[in-house]
């Protein structure tokens, strides 16, 4: 692309408040593994959205400082606010990862992934499978919020596993009770993957 688009002015769209972070315009590039890397975020930034979330970063290898994960978690010098999506199935590692990211001043916003429908993630009990276990979901969210301090934490989740196991209302309530700054609903089930229509009435 060869043009810059000016962000919307304050009078055009009301900003989105995520704790102390003000997103203006209130347009968010959703995180997606293998897609929302730095070059892609840089291209999208030219079109004027307010928040660009990184691709999914796994908590444990981040805590263990594995090179590949550290590179994925890097931001460009021109990126502000720095928004990272974190994935984990163990509250301990999630808490440690958040504490490290915040303590090292690496992020301005953390989004927790509870919506990934990919089988290699869900068969390990992660992503969209976590809200099926509300106590685990609560403990992971609590660990993230506790260690984030003033950095806003949001959560992203789906309607549920399939039409017979819908978990989104409970997931949203747990997020609210544990102090997240916002919740994001992908209004499809994990079984739908990225096919079919979103159920806007659920949103």
What is each model feature region?
Residues 1-203:
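Flavin-dependent oxidoreductase catalytic cores
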């Amino acid at each position: 692309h060869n043009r810059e688009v000016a962000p919307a002015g304050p009078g055009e769209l009301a900003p989105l408040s995520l704790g102390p972070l003000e997103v203006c315009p209130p347009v968010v590039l959703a995180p997606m593994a293998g897609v929302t890397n730095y070059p892609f975020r840089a291209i999208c930034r030219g079109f004027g959205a307010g928040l660009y979330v990184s691709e999914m970063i796994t908590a444990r290898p981040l805590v263990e400082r594995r090179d590949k994960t550290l590179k994925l978690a890097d931001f460009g010098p021109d990126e502000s606010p720095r928004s990272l999506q974190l994935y984990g199935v163990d509250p301990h590692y999630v808490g440690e990862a958040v504490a490290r990211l915040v303590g090292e001043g690496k992020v301005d916003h953390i989004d927790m992934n509870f919506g990934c429908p990919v089988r290699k993630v869900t068969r390990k009990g992660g992503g969209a499978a976590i809200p099926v276990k509300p106590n685990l979901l609560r403990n992971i969210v609590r660990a993230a919020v506790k260690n984030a301090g003033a950095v806003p934490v949001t959560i992203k989740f789906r309607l549920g596993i399939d039409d017979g196991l819908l978990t989104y209302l409970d997931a949203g309530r747990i997020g609210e009770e544990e102090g997240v700054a916002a919740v994001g609903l992908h209004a499809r089930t994990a079984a739908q993957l990225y096919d079919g229509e979103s159920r806007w009435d659920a949103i």
